[in-house]
Design a protein with these regions (language model features):
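Glycine-rich, N-terminal phosphate-binding loop and its surrounding beta-alpha-beta segment
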Residues: 1
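A structural signal for small-residue-enriched, beta-sheet-centric alpha/beta enzyme cores
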Residues: 4-182
Length: 182
């Protein structure tokens, strides 16, 4: 759907034979939550393109964020709902940078300033208190329901600054480091 949308609008890599739309794709593993929900297909890709607009985007339990969860140390029943988030900055020098992130990690989401857990594995399915995942793992607690699969955090960073391949690589590294920061 996305490729067709771009091709119909002649957006892509120009060749002597015509424009070749280049589309990257990524998904989160959310079958434990979203097993009966829609799976990405051409129709959904086209619909996403048609719904795109300038300005703030919907956040939370939308799009790829629908099946996202946080803190899966003791399985999905004790995980917290994840989702889609975004941020944007426009500087005085007309530099624009935006980030769109689908938060679906195994571990906790921690406030870097206070160290407080914002979302993660709960002490019980009904609890509002969080287990500190890293500490629990260090104590070698039994990993009830643990699976190494299904823990994907996706991030896209965009800017209006012209960057060469080396600069793009550096931006990608910084974005990745930002995800891993404790």
């Amino acid at each position: 759907g996305v490729r067709r949308f771009l091709k119909e609008r002649s957006v892509g890599f120009a060749t002597e034979y015509g424009v070749v739309p280049t589309v990257a794709g990524a998904v989160i593993f959310d079958l434990g939550i979203n097993k009966d929900g829609p799976t990405p297909d051409a129709a959904l890709g086209m619909e996403a393109c048609l719904q795109a607009h300038a300005g703030p985007v919907a956040q939370g339990c939308v799009g790829a964020g629908c099946g996202a969860t946080i803190g899966k140390l003791y399985g999905l029943r004790q995980a917290t709902k994840g989702g889609l988030g975004s941020s944007f900055i426009h500087t005085e020098r007309n530099v624009r940078v935006g980030a769109l992130v689908v938060v679906n990690p195994f571990g906790d989401v921690v406030d870097p300033r206070s160290g407080r857990i914002l979302a993660g594995c709960r002490e019980s399915p009904e609890s509002r208190r969080f287990v500190h995942t890293a500490q629990a793992m260090a104590r070698l607690e039994r990993l009830r329901g643990f699976s190494g699969n299904g823990n994907t955090v996706l991030a896209a960073v965009a800017t209006n600054v012209r960057l060469n391949k080396t600069d793009l690589t550096k931006v990608a590294q910084m974005a990745h480091d930002g995800l891993a920061r404790l």
